[in-house]
């Protein structure tokens, strides 16, 4: 049991954007990179998988008719919060 509660208001400084994805159907590949944009590894996410992305870089490739829910903490300023880079998996 989790006792009923509220979350107290507190001004917070956010230095990173964290995101969580829940795969509703289909599948996707996620490519992982370190903070210097160097490729580390890839994993396939399928229906009902959940992933929490906390640091480093990542990219996605839809493999099979994928639908997913993505949640990020805010405020999120789209292009001001994202640095894109090129990568092609061999």
Give the label of every model feature segment.
Residues 1-3, 25-29, 74:
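Short, charged/polar surface micro-motifs in flexible loops or helix N-caps
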Residues 4, 30-31, 52-53, 58-63, ...:
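Short beta-strand His + acidic residue motifs that chelate non-heme Fe in jelly-roll/DSBH
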Residues 34-55:
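Short acidic-glycine-tyrosine-enriched beta hairpin
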